[in-house]
Curated annotation (Swiss-Prot):
Residues 1-37 form a transit peptide. The keyword Cell inner membrane does not apply. Pathway: Energy metabolism; oxidative phosphorylation. Belongs to the cytochrome c oxidase subunit 5A family. The gene is Cox5a. One of its GO terms (biological process) is mitochondrial electron transport, cytochrome c to oxygen. This is Cytochrome c oxidase subunit 5A, mitochondrial. InterPro entries: Cyt_c_oxidase_su5A/6 (IPR003204), Cyt_c_oxidase_su5A/6_sf (IPR036545).
C-alpha cells in the first residue's frame, strides 16, 4: 500500500517536472500518473448504503464487528443515512447493547457538526425505530447537558 502511494507521488512529481527539471515529461508519463489514480470501480451512494445495511443486518454480527463497522463508517467524511443507522441500531438490539446504540446516536450528532438541521432530521426518520426498540436519544437521557 505504501509502495503504491510512493509510486503515485513519484509519478505525479515526475509529471510536474520536480524530479528531473531539465527534461519535460512525456505525454505517456502524464497519462500513466492519471491512470494510477483511476483504478478500481467507484461505488454509488446506493451501493454504499446497501453495503453498510447488509453489514449491520448480518444475523451473526458480534459486538466487535458492530464497533469495527461503526468505527470505519465514522471515519468517512459523511453523516450516515438513516437506513444505515437503523440497521446499526437493530444490530445493537440483537446484541442487547444499549450503550452502543446511544453512542451511535451521539456519533451521528457529532458527525453532523455545525449543520444543525441534519441531526433532528435523522432522529425524525429514526423515531419509529427508536420507539420500537426502546432506545432513548442522548437528549432524552440528559447526556447533552454533561
Amino acid at each position: 500500500m505504501l509502495a503504491a502511494a510512493l509510486r503515485r507521488c513519484t509519478a505525479a512529481a515526475a509529471a510536474r517536472g520536480l524530479l528531473h527539471p531539465a527534461s519535460a515529461p512525456s505525454p505517456a508519463a502524464a497519462v500513466c500518473s492519471i491512470r494510477c489514480y483511476s483504478h478500481g470501480s467507484h461505488e454509488t451512494d446506493e451501493e454504499f448504503d446497501a453495503r453498510w445495511v447488509t453489514y449491520f443486518n448480518k444475523p451473526d454480527i458480534d459486538a466487535w464487528e458492530l464497533r469495527k463497522g461503526m468505527n470505519t463508517l465514522v471515519g468517512y467524511d459523511l453523516v450516515p443515512e438513516p437506513k444505515i443507522i437503523d440497521a446499526a441500531l437493530r444490530a445493537c438490539r440483537r446484541l442487547n447493547d444499549f450503550a452502543s446504540a446511544v453512542r451511535i446516536l451521539e456519533v451521528v450528532k457529532d458527525k453532523a457538526g455545525p449543520h444543525k438541521e441534519i441531526y433532528p432530521y435523522v432522529i425524525q426518520e429514526l423515531r419509529p425505530t427508536l420507539n420500537e426498540l426502546g432506545i432513548s436519544t442522548p437528549e432524552e437521557l440528559g447526556l447533552d447537558k454533561v
